[in-house]
Amino acid sequence: MTTPAGSGNGFGTVSWWGLSPALDLQAESPPVDPDSQSKTEHKIPELDALLLGSVDGRHMLRTLARAMLWPLRRFNFYVLENNLEAVARHMLIFSLALEEPEKMGLQERSETFLELWGNALLRPSVAAFLRAQASHLSNLVPEPDRLEELLPWLSLRPLKFRERDALEAVFRFWSGGEKGPEVFPMSRLWDSRLRHYLGSRYDARRGVADWDLRMKLHDRGAQVIHFHEFRRWRDTGVAFELRDLSAYHVPNRTMASGRLLSHRGERVAARGYWGDIATGPFVAFGIEADDKSLLRTSNGQPVKTASEITQHNVTELFRDVAAWRGPRAIKGNVEETKSPEPDAPAQEPFTIHFLPLDSSQTLHHKTCYRGRFQLLYVSCGMIHLLSPELGACVAPGGNLVVELARYLVDLRPKELKAFSDRVVEIAQAAGFAPHTGTKPSETFARFYKLGDSTRGGGDSAVESGPVPSKVLAPTPESINPPQADQAPSLEVMSPPKVDQTPPLEAMSPPEADQAPPLEAMSPPRADQIPPLEAMSPLQAEVVLPLEAISPPQADLAPPPEVISPVQEALAMSSAIAPLKHVT
């Protein structure tokens, strides 16, 4: 059995990392309205951004790291994911990134981040940190007041009570509530998923990996990914080998998720690894850099690997975020605010709000969200959620950024073109128009919200007169912030939500007449079920390990009623049909 080329089935049902470079969201947002400063709570211009499927927080980290290059601004990030494990990883990543330097040094934080974020297996020391941090977060989730006191940058208030309970259960599982490696045998799960994905080509998996890397990722701009690190990740799931490979043997429980499978004619819940096994975590931070010396070549070969560039970029991000938070922590308008009490904690200059999982089509019903956001980001796996209802939450003149499928190795050029065309159709139906003044990009599609303002830029208030240079942020056409070296910002794209992992493409270039129809090219989306830890005792009794479901992985095929997000975006009908979920 071999999956046809272009099927897009290598990316799983849950996305754990971004598949395109990180964005500075300030560079993507419209100019600041100077009149809005007096309307905000802190008398400081605010950026309200809604992110669908950002997955790993890379856009927010990049935005905070480059905030010192822009005029003072406060950030309100509203994040919507399609599973609570992704929400939990967001919380873990930011709690690590914002850890006090006295408790954990910069290098240790960056190395711990890389392993938790991109490695299927961990070192024992990192696994111990994960257990301790997960236990701490599990105790904070049920206590909103204590959570806001200790983590003032985080808000879980929009989440439903049952979602908070399930989120707590996820952290309990991470902290070792269920003992033993057999609870989540990552190495076996990775190998079984790889066997099912490659099928008859499993014995030639190294050749398949080389083909995908050299003929696809390298051709699409990711030349710095070295074949040794790509092969190692495809074989073992370890992307960043910061120590000897033998040191990595503890399963990374943050990559565990659940789904419904068919077992002897019944639907049962199973825990497994349903993430990406095709592209890898190298694209998010590893193929672009502000320091161009990292990208230089010698004799036609890059002098640095994607792993080395990723480690450098993450370290610089953490250093810049720490430097920005220190002197520029917002306590309100300094001229009008009384001196704070000695014991009062400084207010964070940003807040991350996590929204309910199914709220994309109901946000516009709340007046606090209607017309609020200056920027909307949508990953390619969430494009099916872009609708006129969601567009109503964007202010006139606000910007929309949609990631494209450039780094999805299962997709052929004609499928990539069809996806890009479909994105334009969906965005226009939602009330957006393409930006014509920006440089064309194969990674992101950029739009602006139609309204009272003209194409010239942003809100009508911005166009009514000249804006003081101290407040006006650069226009979207000049994407880079005002700095001397004009270093381009990293761009990011979040991975699509894909289902089962049928095989990769054949070793030889596919024939034109072998291309599957567009409806079959993208990976299907998994059944969304609550975290296994949050189930009732009766439900928990039917939870089976993945290996117990059936022989080899015959029953791992997605149920026929599940619809893929990317497949839905490529459907030829003009209407966006809602996803059908298995109950």
From Swiss-Prot:
Q: What GO biological process terms are annotated to this protein in UniProt?
A: axonemal dynein complex assembly; determination of left/right symmetry; heart development; motile cilium assembly
Keyword annotations for this protein, in alphabetical order, are:
Cilium biogenesis/degradation, Cytoplasm
Subcellular localization is given as: Cytoplasm; Dynein axonemal particle
Q: For the region Disordered, give the residue spans.
A: 455-534
Signal peptide from the UniProt entry: none
Annotated Gene Ontology cellular component terms = dynein axonemal particle
Name where it mostly resides.
cytoplasm
Q: Which InterPro entries match?
A: DNAAF3, DNAAF3_C, DUF4470
Pfam families, per this entry?
DUF4470, DUF4471
Superkingdom of the source? Eukaryota
Q: Which family does it belong to?
A: Belongs to the DNAAF3 family.
Function statement: Required for the assembly of axonemal inner and outer dynein arms. Involved in preassembly of dyneins into complexes before their transport into cilia.
Cite the PANTHER family for this sequence.
DYNEIN ASSEMBLY FACTOR 3, AXONEMAL, DYNEIN AXONEMAL ASSEMBLY FACTOR 3
Name of the featured protein: Dynein axonemal assembly factor 3
| Organism the protein comes from | Rattus norvegicus
